Structures are given as C-alpha cells and as structure tokens.
A protein has these predicted regions:
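Transmembrane beta-barrel domains of outer membrane proteins
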Residues: 9, 77-81, 135-137
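C-terminal beta-signal and terminal closure region of outer-membrane beta-barrel proteins
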Residues: 44, 56, 102-138
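Repeated loop/turn-to-beta-strand initiation elements of outer-membrane beta-barrel proteins
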Residues: 3-6, 83-84
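Membrane-embedded beta-strand positions of outer-membrane beta-barrel proteins
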Residues: 8, 95-97, 134
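Hydrophobic, lipid-facing positions within transmembrane beta-strands of outer-membrane proteins
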Residues: 4, 71-76, 128-134
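Extracytoplasmic gating/loop element in the C-terminal half of outer-membrane beta-barrel translocons
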Residues: 13-94, 99
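Flexible loop/turn segments at secondary-structure boundaries
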Residues: 5-7, 14-19, 103-106
C-alpha cells in the first residue's frame, strides 16, 4: 500500500502427537511436575492422566498434541518518497522492521512443538528476534 510493504509467513503443523515423558513425578530427568494438568481425581475423572502419583518410569502414557500455528516471519518495509530523499541528496531510503518466531499457538507443554524436544537437555524454545534496518543509497 503506497510505499509500505508487509510480508507475513505463518507456519502450521497439524496431526502430530508425541510422548512427553517429563510429566509426572520420578527421577531428576523427569523433573517437570504439572500439578494442575488434568490428573485423575474423584472430581476429575480424566482418562488421559492416570494419577499424580503415577511415576511414568519409561516415559509412556503421556501423549500430547504437537499441533501448532506459528507466526514465523513478519516484515514491514517503508520506502521513502522520491521528493523527500532528493532533498537529502540520496538515491533511496528504506526503513524496515522484521520479526521471527513472534508467537506460537499450541497446546504442547514443551518448549517448542516443532522440535518436540522431551528431555531436560533440549528444552529450548525457538528464539524470538526483532530487527530494525535502515537502507540508504547515495
């Protein structure tokens, strides 16, 4: 629109499930303990989480959806008009703002549903970055 350009890339994956063995009590490698995560209780007769006391020794029984929609790349560029830049004695002037991995919509409780990392040494989220740029031509 006019001198403005917007570019958006949305990444989505549907139909993924993975075991998430870090749920439950147990040894240190299963150190993620989610007290309010749908455990079976007399009031909550869930059939997805057996019990908070279930040790889940082998990492089974905790299959979770890895479906996600991620706002992966957004770029906004403004090209300054010729009359303005000619007064400054330059050939072109462009201002840009871009972002990567701005937000992920998911029910996955790990750090990143795309990587599906399920052990404590790889629970790192995708880095979120924002960059501002200025392009000047003489």
């Amino acid at each position: 629109y006019k001198n403005l350009t917007l570019s958006v890339f949305v990444n989505a994956m549907q139909g993924w499930i993975s075991s998430f063995g870090l749920i439950g009590r147990g040894p240190a490698e299963r150190s993620l303990n989610f007290i309010d995560y749908g455990w079976w209780t007399p009031e909550n007769k869930s059939n997805t989480r057996p019990s908070l006391m279930h040790e889940n020794k082998y990492g089974h029984n905790y299959y979770l959806s890895r479906n996600f929609v991620r706002i992966q790349d957004v770029s906004l560029v403004y090209n300054f008009s010729k009359p303005l830049i000619e007064k400054m004695k330059i050939s072109h002037l462009k201002l840009s703002l871009s972002g990567k991995n701005l937000y992920t919509f998911t029910d996955w409780i790990g750090a990143d549903p795309e990587s599906g990392a399920i052990d404590r040494d790889s629970l790192y989220p995708m880095p979120r970055t924002v960059v501002v740029g200025l392009n000047v031509g003489f």
